[in-house]
Structure formats: C-alpha cells, structure tokens
A protein has these predicted regions:
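Left-handed beta-helix
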Residues: 142-277
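Conserved N-terminal catalytic core of the sugar/cofactor nucleotidyltransferase
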Residues: 1-65, 74-76, 267, 271-275
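Short internal beta-strands
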Residues: 13-17, 88, 247, 263
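Conserved core of the sugar-phosphate nucleotidyltransferase
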Residues: 70-145
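Conserved beta-strand segments of alpha/beta enzyme cores
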Residues: 34-36, 107, 168-170
C-alpha cells in the first residue's frame, strides 16, 4: 500500500471480513487518505468482493490483493496505452499458480489456472490497474450471472470477458513478489523484508540477538536468544527461550520455549513449548 503514493489516489476502499476492526484501525492510523470499509458478509469470491465497491468507483481503479508483497513500478498506470494492467512474476513452479498468457506485444490473452504444461510462467500476483472501469463492471456482471464455481466468482473471469470484448490488458512484470498467503510463505516473506531493511534491533541485558530482527518498543526479553528472522510486536514478554524464524503478535507471553517457524497471535501465552506453533 505504501507504493501508491504519488498516483493521484483519492480514496482507499477496503473489502473486509475476519478481523475487520483490526484492519480499520490500522488503515486509519497508517494512511493519509480517506478510507472506506465494506464488509464482505458472503464469501462469494474476488469478483463478488470488488463488486461491493462498485457504487463508490467512478473512474480508474487500482486493485491490490492483501496476501502479497510486491516490488513494482506503479507509475506505469499513468502512462500505459491500454485499458488495464495485470502485474505478474515469472516463476519456475508455474503449476502452483494462475498464469498469464500473452500475445507477442505483451497483452494478456487468457489466464490459465495451475497449468500442467508451461503455457506461461508469468504468475498472476493479484495486482491490477483498470482504466476502463465500465468494461470491468460489464465483465463482473457477466461473471455473476453465471453459475458459481464452488460457490465463488472470480475477478480473473471478468478480465477474460473484457478481453473477449476487445479490451487490452497489458501484462507487466514485477521486480519482486513475496507471497503471504500461507504460514510458510509468510515467514519466508518476513525474513526477506527484514533483510531488505525493515529490521529494527533492540538490545537487552543477557539476551543474544541475531540479525535481522524487528522488535517494537514495549517488548521485554530476559535470558533468551532471539533471531534471525524474528518479528515481535509491542507488549510481548519473553523469558528463557530460543526463538528463530518466527512472528509474534502483541502482548504475548513466552517462557522456557524453543520456537522455530512459528506464528503466534496477539495475547498468546506459551510455556515449555518445543517446535513450531
């Protein structure tokens, strides 16, 4: 979200669900834009989610899925000669993703979900710019009018409908893409971000800190070994523990434990644990 500055953004619209209050509080505190929050009460897919924002979108729109961290030049949206942009990243394990198939000029022709053969290695990362928003709504209407696929309607099907009606969507490759959609990839992404400069080290008497780490103010640690690749939020207390490659939320209590590859939420209490969590 920090990368949208300078793009002439007039409003941020968040489609929320689980932990909506946490999202709202964070967004209001973090971003200096007007924010609107819409709860998706029926989990009917990405097309259904974006359709909830329709009454409030009257011009070009940037759509960002929240389970990914990316490095991309979003200023391309201001100059591109196209009806939209779909950002993608070349991957070797293309079988795990929806991939973007393009023509010779780099414009999307279709998206293939989890192909068994390498029709493309450009993974769809969930970052889009749509200039022709009316064509987007027409595509979503078409998708929502058809039977749902296992209860969900997909935004990429709306893009396919746009292409079939002669709209041009450019596939642009990102410099970096870090997935946060599963515990393992979230921990991996956390380590990458720490190594790239997000680290924040604090030292404590009798505690060994192995960089990179991110430790907020208000954390207390005693007789422990922390890091590498550990993030700890404010209010957490740790004692007599060894913690590596782990993310810990606010106000947690951890004692006499060895943790590696763990995700601990806010106010979690752990004692005598060995392993991941």
């Amino acid at each position: 979200m920090d990368r949208i500055e300078g793009l002439g953004v007039t409003e941020l619209i968040f489609i929320t669900g689980h932990l909506k209050e946490t999202v709202e509080a964070y967004a209001k505190d973090r971003y200096g834009y007007p924010c609107r929050f819409i709860e998706q009460k029926v989990q009917d897919g990405t097309a259904g989610a974006i359709n909830l924002a329709r009454p409030f979108i009257h011009g070009p729109v940037m759509i960002i899925y929240v389970d990914t961290v990316f490095e991309a030049d979003l200023s391309l949206a201001e100059t591109v000669d196209a009806d939209g942009i779909i950002w993608a990243k070349e991957v070797e394990d293309y079988q795990r993703f929806g991939v973007v198939v393009t023509d010779a000029d780099g414009f999307m022709t279709k998206i293939v979900e989890k192909p068994s053969t390498p029709v493309s290695k450009l993974a769809n990362i969930g970052l889009y710019y749509i200039r022709d928003v009316q064509a987007l709504w027409a595509g979503i209407d078409h998708v929502l009018a058809a039977p749902a696929n296992k209860g969900e309607y997909y935004l990429t099907d709306a893009f396919q409908q746009m292409i079939e009606h002669k709209r041009r969507i450019l596939a642009a490759e990102v410099g970096g893409w870090y997935d946060c959609g599963a515990p393992g990839t979230l921990l991996e992404t956390n380590g990458i971000l720490l190594a790239k400069g997000a680290a924040r080290r604090r030292d404590f008497p009798g505690v060994v800190i192995s960089d990179p780490v991110y430790i907020e103010d208000g954390v207390t640690i005693e007789r422990s070994s922390i890091g590498p690749n550990v993030s700890i939020e404010a209010g957490t207390h740790i004692s007599d523990s060894t913690i590596r490659n782990t993310i810990i939320g606010r106000d947690a209590r951890i004692a006499t434990s060895v943790l590696e590859g763990a995700l601990l939420g806010n106010r979690v209490k752990v004692a005598g644990l060995r392993g991941d969590a």
